[in-house]
């Protein structure tokens, strides 16, 4: 998903990945009308002001483009891992996603960070340089910071919020999202 607010390093990584593997990665962007409506209601950086505003931003920049990306799909393969957060601790290898009416496959569910690092090193997988600068979880630039020593992997995401269950909504079922 090209949210329009990704780090330059992330955009460069997409290009490097396409070149290394000789593939084309589809990019799904938010609709300008949706961005304009969001900015009119909350302000361009209104996501800092409330969880509601942040969820609305993620809806415009992530959820709606994802819906277009998955339109007609029967399977969605993700990179979710149980070790990323308490909220993801029970991630199964495969599950039915009733909101999207598809099977969601999480092949890395039981991989820990050491397994990932070994795989990346052994296979020459391109890596976002932000990982080396303390960003184990990378999203939109304004919503992501480097973590401090000892912090959980996803502590740098939406750091201004107090709730431990911070998610953008991509991997949260509707009823769980309503509880957040």
Swiss-Prot record:
E.C. number(s) listed in UniProt = 1.8.4.10
GO cellular component terms listed in the entry, alphabetical order = cytoplasm
CDD domains (UniProt xref): PAPS_reductase (cd23945)
Listed under catalytic activity are:
[thioredoxin]-disulfide + sulfite + AMP + 2 H(+) = adenosine 5'-phosphosulfate + [thioredoxin]-dithiol
Q: What does the record give as its pathway?
A: Sulfur metabolism; hydrogen sulfide biosynthesis; sulfite from sulfate
What job does the chain carry out?
Catalyzes the formation of sulfite from adenosine 5'-phosphosulfate (APS) using thioredoxin as an electron donor.
Family of this protein: Belongs to the PAPS reductase family. CysH subfamily.
PANTHER family, sorted: 5'-ADENYLYLSULFATE REDUCTASE 1, CHLOROPLASTIC, 5'-ADENYLYLSULFATE REDUCTASE 3, CHLOROPLASTIC
Name the UniProt record assigns to this protein: Adenosine 5'-phosphosulfate reductase
Per the UniProt entry, what species is this protein from, by scientific name?
Rhizobium tropici
């Amino acid at each position: 998903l090209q949210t329009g607010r990704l780090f330059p390093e992330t955009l460069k990584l997409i290009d490097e990945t396409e070149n290394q593997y000789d593939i084309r990665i589809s990019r799904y962007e938010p609709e300008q009308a949706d961005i304009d409506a969001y900015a009119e209601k909350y302000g361009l950086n209104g996501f800092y002001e409330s969880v509601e505003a942040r969820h609305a931003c993620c809806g415009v920049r992530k959820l709606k483009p994802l819906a277009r990306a998955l339109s007609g799909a029967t399977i969605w393969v993700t990179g979710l891992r149980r070790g990323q957060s308490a909220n993801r601790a029970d991630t199964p290898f495969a599950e039915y996603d009733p909101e999207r009416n598809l099977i969601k496959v999480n092949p890395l569910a039981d991989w820990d960070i050491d397994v990932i690092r070994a795989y990346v090193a052994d296979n020459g997988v391109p890596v976002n340089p932000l990982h080396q600068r303390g960003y184990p979880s990378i999203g939109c630039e304004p919503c992501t910071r480097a973590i401090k020593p000892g912090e959980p992997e996803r502590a740098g995401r939406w750091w201004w919020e107090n709730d431990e269950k911070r998610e953008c909504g991509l991997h949260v079922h509707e009823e769980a999202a309503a509880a957040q």
